[in-house]
């Protein structure tokens, strides 16, 4: 699957004369677009997508930026040799967090948030793939993004790595296979290990997009695993889409609130 690049809109200028928030999407891989998260965000914000591993530079400051979304990809979050753009992305994550500009990390994006705050990212010893059950923790009941949602959700997974939680982070979702599934750091920085963003078409393409990982872990059973995943897409996609749209909309509430507060202070 090839995803066409969007025209990049500059984010360096002040947001003072713009009626909608500005959100930067960092896309590391063409087969992991913003999907449903992007659809929800574009309805309420001006969204610019950049491809840093294709040579597009990341902004050096957060000027003109109201929120940051970091998407997934097959690369390892610690691979600065093959992914040198990570060196510029980590300080951008820290700056957004320090300034109260909401951050939303998906899979690799969540791992990069953990790394930005000094925590290791590592192979957890297996692979999670398919619409697998994930449980909300008790802390999620008081969280702005997750309060009131069903305790168990089935959401698309495709990862081999995990991470340690940043100091002070609150664990919001977990499962028995890989404990750290979702967390909040501070009030507005969120990491999600799973792929809540996938459209139905992208979810159906995941097994082939990640075929090498399936063969590595399942060998001759890889085709059976592919069939399982495709059946789970049909069974659980609607549930996952509802979860994604709800969580993304609530995160955008945080973006709008933080932006309004900055404008109030600057007035």
Q: Which residues make up each language-model segment?
A:
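Glycine-rich, phosphate-binding/catalytic loops in enzymes
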Residues: 40-43, 84-88, 121-122, 174, ...
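C-terminal helical/coil "lid" or tail adjacent to the Rossmann-like core of SAM-dependent
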Residues: 188, 193, 197-233
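Cysteine-nucleophile active-site neighborhood
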Residues: 70-140
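Hydrophobic/aromatic beta-strand patches that form the interior of the parallel beta-sheet core
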Residues: 24, 50, 69, 104, ...
């Amino acid at each position: 699957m090839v995803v066409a690049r969007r025209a990049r809109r500059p984010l360096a200028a002040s947001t003072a004369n713009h009626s909608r928030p500005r959100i930067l999407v960092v896309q590391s891989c063409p087969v992991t677009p913003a999907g449903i998260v992007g659809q929800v965000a574009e309805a309420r914000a001006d969204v610019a997508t950049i491809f840093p591993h294709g040579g597009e530079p990341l902004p050096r400051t957060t000027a003109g930026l109201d929120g940051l979304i970091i998407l997934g990809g097959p690369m390892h979050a610690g691979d600065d040799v093959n992914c040198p753009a990570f060196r510029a992305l980590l300080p951008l994550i820290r700056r957004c967090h320090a300034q109260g500009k909401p951050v939303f990390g998906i899979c690799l994006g969540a791992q990069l948030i953990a790394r930005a705050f000094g925590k290791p990212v590592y192979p957890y010893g297996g692979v999670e793939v398919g619409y697998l059950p994930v449980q909300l923790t008790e802390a999620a009941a008081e969280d702005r993004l997750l309060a009131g949602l069903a305790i168990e959700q089935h959401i698309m997974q495709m990862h081999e790595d995990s991470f340690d939680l940043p100091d002070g982070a609150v664990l919001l979702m977990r499962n028995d296979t890989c404990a750290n599934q979702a967390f909040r750091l501070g009030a507005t920085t969120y990491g999600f290990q799973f792929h809540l963003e996938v459209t139905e078409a992208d979810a159906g393409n995941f097994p082939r997009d990640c075929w090498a990982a399936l063969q590595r872990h399942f060998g001759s059973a890889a085709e059976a695993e592919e069939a399982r995943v495709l059946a789970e897409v049909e069974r659980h996609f609607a549930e996952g889409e509802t979860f994604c749209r709800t969580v993304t909309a609530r995160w955008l509430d945080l973006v709008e609130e933080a932006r309004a507060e900055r404008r109030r202070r600057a007035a």
